[in-house]
From Swiss-Prot:
Region (Disordered): 141-163, 236-262
Name of the gene encoding the protein in the UniProt record: TMEM72
Cellular component GO terms, alphabetical: membrane
Biased composition (Polar residues): 147-163
Pfam families assigned: TMEM72
Name the UniProt record assigns to this protein: Transmembrane protein 72
Record key words, sorted: Membrane, Transmembrane, Transmembrane helix
Subcellular location: Membrane
Superkingdom: Eukaryota
Membrane-spanning residues: 16-36, 41-61, 86-105, 109-131
Recorded topology in the membrane: Multi-pass membrane protein
Length: 275
């Protein structure tokens, strides 16, 4: 609490020093111009006083406008007011130090110019100290309400709650219509990778509980809703015939060793009737 009071007091001190320095610069510049001996220095002092007045006066103008008019949050006027209210303190420190250099070039000839130069240095150092203050932290974001995401390509809808660990995924038409995908799916079914008994009616709901290895992790439930494909028997048989290789058929009654054949000479004699 005491630190906050210190920073607030330092801020108002910097504003007061800035306005006072601008007034001194304009006053000394006007007097130097009226003397007519150092007109270039007089113009420089007047220019420096005007620049400091703009930098410091923007804060007071913003405060006055905030009292007279109510700006909507996020509007252009509100952003301009915030910029004027929190103009860079470190940038002011550098600018005031650079502007004070010319005030010490001829301190013997124009001794009274060292007064606004010293005030510029003091004001710059005060702003440098103010720049070390930490910025106010933004308020914590409010927990977002559950969002819903839709993927048009797969017609999948996912609903995720920020406070709930349950996730639900719904898939409509998970299998794409086409000869390639249908062929691959039916081929896997016919080969036995997916038994017919495991098939369920269309639009059934399967619940799978996923438990991570870490015992401290929360349980998640994933729900899948899938549409099954009905297989036409004729098309399945045609695909099975196209994929299956020709099989060799053997008979159990076929003898393993063929009977011996009669010699060719004896068979010819028998045919002529000699025996």
């Amino acid at each position: 609490m005491q630190l906050q009071v210190f920073w607030t007091g330092l801020e108002y001190t910097c504003r007061l020093l800035g306005i006072t320095t601008a007034a001194v610069l304009i006053g000394v510049g006007t007097e130097t111009f009226l003397q007519g001996q150092f007109k270039s220095l007089a113009f420089y002092l007047l220019f420096t006083g005007a620049a400091v007045s703009i930098c410091e006066g923007a804060y007071f103008v913003a405060q006055l406008l905030a009292i007279c008019f109510q700006c909507q949050p996020g509007s252009l006027a509100d952003r301009v007011r915030e910029k004027a209210h929190w103009l860079g303190c470190f940038q002011k420190f550098l600018a005031y130090l650079l502007l004070s250099v010319a005030c010490f070039l001829h301190p013997v000839l124009v001794w009274h110019v060292t007064i606004p130069g010293s005030m510029l240095i003091i004001t710059g150092l005060a702003y440098f100290l103010l720049s070390k203050r930490k910025k106010r932290k933004a308020a914590p974001e409010v927990l977002a309400s559950p969002e819903q995401y839709t993927d048009p390509s797969s017609s999948a809808v996912s609903t995720t709650g920020s406070g709930d660990t349950e996730q639900t995924y719904t898939f409509h038409g998970a299998l794409k219509e086409g000869p390639s995908s249908l062929f691959i799916h039916m081929k896997s079914i016919l080969k036995g990778t997916k038994k017919p008994s495991a098939l369920q009616p269309p639009n059934t709901l399967m619940e799978l509980s996923l438990e991570p290895a870490d015992s401290l992790a929360k349980k998640k439930q994933v729900h899948f809703e899938d549409n099954l494909v009905r297989i036409v028997p004729s098309l399945a048989e045609g695909l099975d015939d196209g994929d299956s290789e020709p099989e060799e058929t053997t008979s159990d009654t076929t003898p393993i060793i063929p009977p011996p054949q009669a010699p060719l000479f004896l068979s010819s004699l028998t045919a002529t009737g000699l025996f």
